[in-house]
């Protein structure tokens, strides 16, 4: 199952756009950032059409909350209807019973096989921890979109103590694809289920044709990065027959899949498409990925998102700047920090121009089109330095930054 540099589109090649953690609806009532999430979700759908993919696979947290507003529903439904409902022919076949994998009460088959709607580019999605199922009927926002024929919600978990992961099986020419999904389960509960042997992954039945090969693609939405006090699902807990795993939940975007030397599976931490915190991982480039699969070979192409609001972060240790830690020096410290923020704003604007350089070169964009950036200056002020109130300081940059109340973060070194 080697990764190759490129696979040509063709009758034997699955082309799949991978995305996760879109968090549609995040800060939707903010006057500056309110449209960010659905603007980027629309860009992702545009990319899928431009790349002529067979399907989109989404790894959880499509919505930021499990009870989205009418505004969030409207923008997602509009985008899916504009992009997924089309005359593009479906070039693959579903060769398994989808009812177990989709586990819905109604319409237990993918939308592209419903004669009442014309789906040409389906989206397959699992629930994350933000848009998980709740209520008496355990309904997720994805169930609403699924029953409307706008996406396919799969990987549902009905009983956290007894989980069976059943794949959707597809065929395209000489290539066979098994698509697995496991929606977000609290780590402690999932680890207990694993330890008791009650998590089962069903493999495709090859008894009728022992020579048939399946490319096994898995979507999961769990903690992946070790942090103090945080439980994670280890990659080695997943079955060894998996070929590729789209790992949702973590927002840091890694530019390529990494092979696990024990299981042999390639793990892609695709990251979020919008910054939901002012943390270092959110400053990385935001990408979606086109996964091409032919037989057991695959290639993964990152595509940078251009609509993402630029985010620049910087750390300053005042004791290393040469500034004196005296009360009479407060003005000089303030001016130094203001200068740092102004430089960061300039850097953010350059990042936007670089990411959208073709539009600038073609005259489709100008300087005024650059969005207000996200800026976070982390200042370590141990040693007796006097600094301005963080909110007062941040409000100096109204009209220049998007996060007008939390530009600066002061902290002291732990002893």
Regions found by a protein language model. Name each.
Residues 10, 117, 212, 333, ...:
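Solvent-exposed loop and beta-edge segments used for protein-protein assembly and interaction
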Residues 18, 58, 125, 218, ...:
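Structural beta-sheet core signal
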Residues 282-285, 290-308:
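Active-site C-terminal subdomain of aminotransferase-like
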Residues 299-415:
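Accessory, non-catalytic peripheral segments of nucleic-acid enzymes
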Residues 16, 179, 374-375:
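Conserved hydrophobic helix-helix packing surfaces used for dimerization/oligomerization
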Residues 55, 67-292:
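His/Asp/Glu-rich metal-coordinating catalytic cores
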Residues 1-110, 211:
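N-terminal active-site segment of His-dependent metallophosphoesterases
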Residues 50, 210, 239, 369-371:
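Alpha-helix termination/capping residues and helix-transition junctions
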């Amino acid at each position: 199952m080697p990764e190759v540099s490129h696979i040509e589109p063709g009758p034997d090649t699955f082309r799949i756009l991978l995305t996760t953690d879109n968090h549609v609806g995040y800060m939707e009532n903010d006057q500056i950032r309110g449209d960010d999430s659905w603007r980027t979700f629309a860009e992702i759908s545009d990319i899928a059409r431009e790349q002529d993919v067979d399907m989109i696979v989404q790894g959880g947290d499509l919505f930021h909350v499990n009870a989205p507003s009418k505004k969030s529903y409207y923008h997602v439904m509009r985008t899916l209807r504009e992009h997924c409902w089309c005359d593009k022919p479906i070039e693959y076949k579903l060769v398994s019973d989808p009812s177990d994998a989709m586990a819905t009460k109604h319409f237990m088959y993918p939308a592209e096989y419903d004669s009442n709607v014309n789906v040409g580019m389906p989206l397959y999605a699992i629930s994350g921890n933000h848009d998980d199922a709740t209520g008496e009927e355990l309904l997720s926002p994805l169930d609403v979109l699924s029953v409307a024929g706008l996406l396919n919600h799969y990987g549902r978990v009905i009983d956290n103590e007894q989980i069976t992961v059943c794949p959707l099986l597809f065929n395209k020419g000489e290539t066979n694809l098994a698509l697995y999904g496991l929606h977000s389960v609290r780590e402690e509960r999932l680890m207990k289920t694993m330890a008791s042997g009650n998590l089962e992954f069903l493999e495709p039945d090859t008894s009728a044709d022992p020579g048939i090969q399946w490319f096994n693609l898995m979507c999961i939405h769990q903690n992946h990065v070790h942090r103090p006090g945080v439980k994670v699902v280890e990659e080695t807990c997943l079955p060894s027959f998996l070929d590729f795993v789209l790992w949702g939940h973590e927002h840091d975007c890694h530019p390529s899949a990494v092979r696990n030397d024990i299981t042999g599976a390639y793990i892609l931490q695709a990251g979020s498409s919008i910054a939901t915190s002012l943390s270092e991982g959110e400053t990385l480039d935001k990408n979606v990925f086109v996964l091409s699969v032919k037989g057991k070979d695959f290639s993964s192409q990152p595509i940078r998102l251009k609509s993402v609001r630029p985010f620049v972060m910087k750390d300053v240790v005042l004791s290393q700047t040469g500034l004196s830690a005296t009360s009479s020096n407060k003005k000089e410290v303030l001016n130094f920090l203001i200068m740092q923020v102004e430089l960061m704003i300039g850097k953010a604007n350059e990042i936007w121009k670089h990411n959208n350089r073709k539009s600038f070169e073609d005259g489709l964009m100008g300087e005024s089109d650059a969005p207000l950036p996200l800026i976070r200056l982390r200042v370590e002020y141990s040693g007796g330095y006097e600094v301005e109130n963080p909110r007062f300081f941040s409000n100096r940059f109204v009209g220049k930054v998007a996060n007008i109340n939390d530009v600066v973060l002061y902290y002291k070194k732990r002893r």
